[in-house]
């Protein structure tokens, strides 16, 4: 693991914290931040702006503290909801980005629209945060491949930890395709020893002629 520090925008870090507070309450969130070793964030969430100042280490520590306090299943629920909030915050802030993405996706099949949307938002993530992702695909899936991941930063595990990213992708895929949901599964995770993280998004089944 690297000792270098990388950052999320403040707004995304704030979204992780406010989503957690909505789920477990203000007092429990304060206890969780103490457990995470981040007492400075109690009643002092980052500002609602896109400056890259919320460390990957903080994202990772908050995720781990949820695992420690509530167990894997509840931590997954929290992380997925926080990911959805992160995506929605990005849309609300960057209306021009959303409009440009919608324009790019205005023509073509649903499959083509999703591919364009994923590539668009991968570029957006790479621009406004220190997370590094790329898009790949085959006949059955699109793959959101994460080269530098805040969710498992300096963590090791025997199960995937990228549920925050799953939430982002669920919200993004539904937004890009008129509310239709897709099956999304993390099948590679850096914390498990994989070189890169990868989430696969199942493509719609082609209708038989």
Q: For each of these PLM feature ranges, what is it?
A:
Residues 23-24, 42, 62, 114-116, ...:
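Weak global preference for isoleucine
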């Amino acid at each position: 693991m690297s000792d270098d520090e990388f950052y999320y925008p403040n707004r995304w870090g704030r979204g992780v914290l406010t989503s957690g507070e909505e789920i477990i309450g203000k007092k429990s969130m304060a206890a969780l931040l103490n457990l995470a070793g981040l007492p400075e964030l109690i009643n002092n969430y980052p500002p609602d702006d896109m400056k890259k100042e919320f460390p990957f280490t903080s994202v990772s520590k908050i995720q781990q503290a949820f695992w420690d306090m509530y167990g894997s299943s509840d931590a997954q629920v929290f992380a997925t909801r926080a990911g959805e909030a992160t995506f929605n915050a990005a849309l609300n802030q960057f209306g021009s980005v959303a409009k440009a993405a919608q324009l790019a996706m205005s023509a073509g099949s649903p499959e083509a629209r999703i591919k364009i949307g994923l590539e668009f938002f991968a570029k957006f993530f790479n621009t406004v945060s220190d997370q590094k992702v790329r898009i790949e695909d085959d006949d059955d899936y699109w793959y959101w491949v994460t080269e530098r991941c805040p969710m498992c930063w300096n963590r090791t595990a025997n199960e995937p930890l990228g549920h925050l990213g799953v939430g982002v992708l669920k919200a993004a895929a539904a937004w890009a395709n008129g509310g239709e949901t897709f099956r999304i599964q993390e099948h590679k995770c850096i914390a498990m020893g994989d070189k890169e993280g990868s989430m696969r998004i199942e493509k719609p089944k082609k209708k038989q002629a």
